[in-house]
Structure formats: C-alpha cells, structure tokens
Amino acid sequence: MSTPGINWSRLVAWMASNVPDVGEPTGVSLISGGKSNLTYRIDTRAGAEDRALVLRRPPLGHVLPTAHDMRREWRVISALAGTAVPVPEPVALCVDEDVIGAPFYLMGHVEGQAVRGRQDVRLSPEDARALSERLAEILAAIHAVDYEAVGLADFGRPDGYMARQLERWGQQWERSKTRELPEYDRLAARLRDRLPAASRAALVHGDYRLDNTLVRLAPGAAPDIRAVVDWEMSTLGDPIADLGLTLTYWHDPGDDERSALPVAGDITLTPGFLDSRGFAEHYARMSGADLGDLDFYVAFGNYKLAVIVEGIHARFVQGKTVGEGFDEIGAAVPLLVARAHRALDEGL
C-alpha cells in the first residue's frame, strides 16, 4: 500500500505494539482539504467491528522550524477533552520519526465535514445564522478555558505575545519567501508602530475558522459543530488575535476581491450567515471582550496569513505539496498584504 507521507508496514507494526485495542489497520486514505499538516483516515477492524481513526503528521518538504509540532497539537486536544470545547478523542502520539518519517498522532474519527463553500452544504437562513453564532460561541469557549486547570499553564508565554508574534512571522517570512515584496516590509513596520496594549491571556487556537471545525449535517436537524481541529498553531496569547484571523478569512457580501483569494471559502455568503462585524459583535457578547483595537488584529491576521500562504507556495514551487489546489495560491500573498494595509487605513 503506497500513500505519500505514510510507511504503511511500519505504521501497522507500531499500532500493533502501541494501540492494539483499536484493531488491525486495514486501509489508509488522504483526507482532502489540508494545505499544511497532512491528515489521513486510518480504517481498522477489531473482530466484527470496523472503526476509523485520523492520523496527523507534518507536511512533506520545506517545514518551518517552529511550525507543525505534533506534540503541541496532541497536548492541547488531550487537555481539552472533556471541556466545553469540542475536540476529537486523543488516541496516541508517536515521536519516533523512524515509523513514518515524522512525528504523528492518532485521534478518533469525528462524524462531520469541514464546510468551506456553499457547494458543500445547503443551509436555511435560520440554520446559517445558528451555525455562525455557534462558531463565535465556541471561539469564546476556547478563550474562556482555565488553561492552568487543564494542565496548559506552560503552553506559551502570554506576556509580550503580540510583539513576539510580529517578530516570529517576520522571521518565518524571511525563511519562506520566494520573492521580494516591499509592501510586506512596510506592513511589518506599520504593525510594529500600531502595537496595542496587551489584552488578557487566554488559550488561542491560532487558525480558527469554520473549515477547521467538523460540522454534522443531518436531515431535519440543525448543523452541529462536533469538533474543532487543526490546533498546530495554538498557544497562550491574545484572544483578539484569534478573532482577527477568523475575520481575515470571512467573505462579506460585496467583497469581490475576496473571491480571488484561494484561501477563503464562500460559506459566509450564505443568506442568514452573520457578516464579519456581526460575528465579532456576537463573540464580544459571549466573551465580554473589548474590540477597540480590532482593526489592528484584522490587519495582523492578513499579515500572518500572507506568511503562511507564502510557505505553502514555497512547498508547491519545490514540488513538495500533497493534494490539489496549490497552483494559484502564491497570488494570494500580495492581496493579503494589501488588505492588511486597508484594514489599518479604513477599518473592518
């Protein structure tokens, strides 16, 4: 059995030794949609019972030094199991790179789908509003987690978080960039000059959006967010930075430029879905957060996303991406930089 990023025989042997209770692995398939860490479905059988697991591993090829840490993802979903934040069941972590060529972890398969575009699901206006409100409520729940009580007191350094984030993503840009973009350099300087006073410390997801959740869609029932996934950039930090990045992905009616960004789906254009400002206001009601500096955080979200997309583009140029949809992604970077400048100049 040949699947990019998986050494099947070694994985089967490791699972037999370390997680025999899940059954014998019978098949593997790449789950589509991921442009960062790779996600696979692992089918198993124990007696007459079939079960599905999910395996997460870093991407192939160019990998940034502080990104794609499987231990962090594993640790945070393990800590959140049993809290008000829905996450998949943690199953096992493997840090031995000899097994499949990189660290990985296994988690339970969640019945649900990543909803990105209107083609993925038909929603009534009532269901669209309920789903967007629930997305805001879960973000508030993440930020309300008592991170010390769940064992994440040392999961990050919230003091000076935004200043370090600006420095970190600037360094990542230098490592990943495939071209010179003077407007990116000007943006970095503007963000440093506009750095707001520190917000409260909270657990932050780092890449929160609807298609990083799994939504159960059942006939006759309202859509239900069953799990938040893709915790690779989670840490302790400023919760409004999480909100700002979510709004970076948001596609509002009349925003034609957003359609040119391959990193954004159009699910938020569904009639009834909250627009970006409505989403932010609902989050503020649920969390009690002060959104006075939200424009800065939206600009920072575009800045951060530009670096992430440039890293994906670099892997595509090297021929190291797995899956489809990478050929035009590099064109999104200058657009994201321009949108960040516009957020600073004009607001949300």
Can you say where each PLM-predicted feature lies in the sequence?
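Catalytic-loop of the protein kinase fold
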Residues: 203-205, 210
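Active-site activation/catalytic loop segments of kinase-like enzymes and analogous catalytic loops
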Residues: 241-287, 301-319
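Activation of the activation-loop gatekeeper triad in protein kinase-fold domains
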Residues: 229-234
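Juxta-kinase regulatory segment immediately upstream of eukaryotic protein kinase catalytic domains
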Residues: 1-22
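All-alpha amphipathic helical-bundle segments outside canonical DNA-binding/catalytic cores
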Residues: 156-157, 289-301
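ATP-binding pocket architecture of kinase catalytic cores
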Residues: 25-203, 220-223
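Hydrophobic residue at the +6 position relative to the catalytic HRD Asp in the kinase catalytic loop
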Residues: 213-215
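Helical subdomain adjoining the active site within ATP-dependent kinase catalytic cores
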Residues: 289-293, 307-348
